[in-house]
Amino acid sequence: MNDYLIKAINASKDLRLLTINGKDLVAEAQKRHDTWSASSAVLGRSLLGTLLLAGAELKGDQELTLRLLGDGPVGAAVVTAKSDLTVKGYVQNNHVALPAREDGHIDVKKAVGKGWLQVTKDLGLKQPYTGEVPIVSGEIAEDLTYYLAKSEQIPSAVGLSVFVNPNDTIGAAGGFLLQALPGASEELLQETEDRIKALPQLSSAFLDGMTPEDLAKKILGDDCKILEKDEVSYHCDCSKEKYAGMLETLKGSQLKEMIDEDHGAELVCNFCGNKYNFTEAELQAILDKKLGK
């Protein structure tokens, strides 16, 4: 498997780490949405970050949605990941490319802007739970770190990186989520923080062939233990049946307008771009069902 996430623990079992290589899934998203460089970086980092949160927190049939509601040119980013580590997402504006920063990297901070980061968890309870924090950086990894500290009170460090080639294809995509467990000493936390600061630029390292296992050893040390290795992928579960169900929630007058004026309907999935066409007869059947005919 090319795209996968690993869960690891350090030798003293007081640091938990998830690392991910997600080049292919980010490339799939880029192709589906035809995103340009800045949009790809925002979407790619959001996909990776949401998968890391899902890997750390979800089980069973649970799912988690990240909403990055910035006022930058890319607009909002919406990403949903499930406990099986499938993910889907989109940004409001696909065709955004910005002048590079002085160091040559994509200006993700400018692309995102100011606003709010929301994380909604559907844990199978009566109501989903949403945590919200202001966007403090716009680089996304720092914003997720802030969210985990403020909303969930978990000392964490997040790193995310997406390398976009000059032709807008994806060259590399990966990242990590480190969490301190109860009992972790200040000395250990400082030592680990120093290791993270000494890491090579993530996208360059992934381009050079670094694996999630390599990254885990760089952060936790060679004596860390790999607990799990799971495939991650881009997958949208949309279907014509689901969209028919959505049409059933419309007012009868709206359906009648689609039949009489548009002579059908075409619905496009935000997450994957798939198009679903409904004929006049199909819309009439939905309307009849709604009216109890």
Curated annotation (Swiss-Prot):
Which terms does the UniProt entry file under GO BP? protein refolding
Which Gene3D superfamilies does this UniProt record tie to the protein? Answer: Hsp33 domain, HSP33 redox switch-like
Q: Entry's Pfam families?
A: HSP33 (PF01430)
Q: Name one GO cellular component term.
A: cytoplasm
Q: What does this protein do?
A: Redox regulated molecular chaperone. Protects both thermally unfolding and oxidatively damaged proteins from irreversible aggregation. Plays an important role in the bacterial defense system toward oxidative stress.
Q: Report the sequence similarity comment from the record.
A: Belongs to the HSP33 family.
Q: What protein name does the entry list?
A: 33 kDa chaperonin
Specify the taxonomic lineage. Bacteria, Bacillati, Bacillota, Bacilli, Lactobacillales
